[in-house]
């Protein structure tokens, strides 16, 4: 059962809440030498649009099944990736 629990725990990493690097609902926020101006999370997202699947990098996925010693078979699938930008809203 621990395998199933760990698979369930990694099955939803791409589900994230709305987020934005914003200050005052639309003003820019400096982030060191690589400063990026980010707006608030509006209808178009913090970086001017909503995140697209192409915004994510290092996406990996896998699916399969396994059988326990008692003969029960379980199926699993997962996918994950990293958002490479500094602004955006889901």
Curated annotation (Swiss-Prot):
Residues in a coiled coil are: none
The processes (GO biological process) annotated in the record are:
sorocarp development
Chain ranges passing through the membrane: none
Short name of one Pfam family: Coiled
Q: Which domain of life is it from?
A: Eukaryota
Could you tell me which InterPro entries the record lists for this protein? HssA/B-like_chaperone, HssA/B-related
Q: Which family is this protein grouped under?
A: Belongs to the hssA/B family.
Report the protein name in the record: HssA/B-like protein 4
Q: Which species is this record about? A: Dictyostelium discoideum (Social amoeba)
Identify the gene encoding this protein.
hssl4
């Amino acid at each position: 059962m621990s395998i199933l629990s760990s698979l369930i725990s990694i099955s939803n990493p791409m589900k994230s809440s709305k987020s934005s690097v914003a200050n005052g609902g639309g003003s820019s926020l400096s982030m060191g030498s690589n400063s990026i101006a980010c707006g608030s999370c509006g209808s178009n997202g913090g970086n001017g649009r909503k995140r697209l699947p192409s915004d994510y990098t290092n996406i990996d996925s896998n699916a399969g099944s396994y059988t326990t010693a008692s003969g029960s078979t379980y199926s699993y699938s997962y996918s994950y990736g990293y958002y490479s930008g500094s602004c955006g809203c889901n």
